[in-house]
UniProtKB/Swiss-Prot annotation:
The keyword Ribonucleoprotein does not apply. It is found in: Cell membrane. InterPro entries: NADH_UbQ_OxRdtase_chain4L/K (IPR001133), NUOK/Mnh_C1-like (IPR039428). NDH-1 shuttles electrons from NADH, via FMN and iron-sulfur (Fe-S) centers, to quinones in the respiratory chain. The immediate electron acceptor for the enzyme in this species is believed to be a menaquinone. Couples the redox reaction to proton translocation (for every two electrons transferred, four hydrogen ions are translocated across the cytoplasmic membrane), and thus conserves the redox energy in a proton gradient. Keywords: Cell membrane, Membrane, NAD, Quinone, Translocase, Transmembrane, Transmembrane helix, Transport. This is NADH-quinone oxidoreductase subunit K. Belongs to the complex I subunit 4L family. Its EC number is 7.1.1.-. It is an enzyme of class 7 (translocase). The gene is nuoK.
Length: 105
């Protein structure tokens, strides 16, 4: 076949599960907004890996197309999120998500 299936698809799915678990643990444990964004991106990449793996197993392109759109939306999310984090950092001198709650007062 090709190089993608030189490794069994199960290994890609296990890797995606491990990446998603690391990202979810980071979102639950960390309080720094930049680290939270990196963990969310890790979770999105794990979902993309799962979509691409199932797409290649089934032989269609639907999963790859959805993964591409997820990457586009994630890029837009990062742009908006980093702008908000920079605004919070300029006013509070901290990137903690606890300080974001203080913006409403």
């Amino acid at each position: 076949m090709n190089d993608f299936f030189s490794v069994e698809p199960n290994y890609y799915l296990v890797l995606a599960a491990v990446l998603f678990t690391i990202g979810a643990a980071g979102v639950l444990v960390r309080r720094n907004a930049i680290v939270l964004f990196m963990c969310v991106e890790l979770m999105l990449n794990a979902a993309n890996l799962t979509l691409v793996t199932f797409s290649r197993i089934n032989g269609d392109l639907n999963g790859q197309i959805i993964a591409f759109f997820v990457m586009v939306v994630a890029a837009a999310e990062v742009v908006v999120g980093l702008a908000i984090i920079m605004a919070i950092f300029r006013t509070r001198r901290s990137a903690s998500v606890d300080d974001a709650n203080l913006l409403k007062y």
